[in-house]
Amino acid sequence: MAAPVVTMQNLIEAGAHFGHQTHRWNPRMKPYIFGARNGIHILDLSQTVPLFARALDFIASTAASGGKVLFVGTKRQAQGPIADAARASGQHFVNHRWLGGMLTNWKTISNSIKRLKTLEEQLSGDTSGLTKKEVLNKTRERDKLEMSLGGIRDMGGIPDVMFVIDANKEELAIKEANVLGIPVVAILDSNVSPDGIAFPVPANDDAARAIRLYCDAVAQAATRGGQQARADRGEDLGAAVEPVAEPALVEEAAAPVTEDEQVPAEAAAETERQSDA
């Protein structure tokens, strides 16, 4: 089963080679840094391409064996792409604040998910027996639970692999995955440590276009793996009532920048970092 291919050209067009300012680097990323330009580290994409290919192969094979993929990215510019990619591939996601114990205390989390589903049933049914205040309180509780747990409501247990955007911001999620022996695929910018990451992918983790590229590629790998799993079970994929749609091609996510969009990638990435701070 062929995983999607992300080329060096795709990565360059998305600005994936631009790291942080040199004074903000993490020395443990030195093996993945090509050099510096205008005070900004340049990541070595000749390593990124094969490392990402290896990670995508692992995700595809995990999904093909029936495994669950958890997408994690809570920073502002990652929230949309993370949710879109997980939904498109029939997988799971966390794109708001990571709750402590979300994996290591799964029993408590699963009880909260049950509460979410109960509230949804109550609010979608006849609420005439409730006061306006009771309806309002239940609605607020449901919305809060949906924001935190909606992306994992159907996961049914801990995932088999975790994909992370921004290893610094998602440090707690990675620690929980490490405790449970869950392999982590992570996009690593020049300011993070690769420790605890089974599948490191050195690349910019701030530029919105680059994040979309990574998420689409992982979604495509998970989709192909899931299709293989269903085929192995003898399911007729063509007869599915609502077949899982394969995400847009990776090449489309990294389409050339138009003249109207043309902004130096360094400036764009730095602007997004500052606004997310």
UniProtKB/Swiss-Prot annotation:
One of its GO terms (molecular function) is structural constituent of ribosome. Residues 239-257 have a biased composition (Low complexity). GO terms for cellular component: cytosolic small ribosomal subunit. GO terms for biological process: translation. Residues 226-277 are annotated as: Disordered. Belongs to the universal ribosomal protein uS2 family. This is Small ribosomal subunit protein uS2. It comes from Sphingopyxis alaskensis (strain DSM 13593 / LMG 18877 / RB2256) (Sphingomonas alaskensis). The lineage of its organism: Bacteria, Pseudomonadati, Pseudomonadota, Alphaproteobacteria, Sphingomonadales.
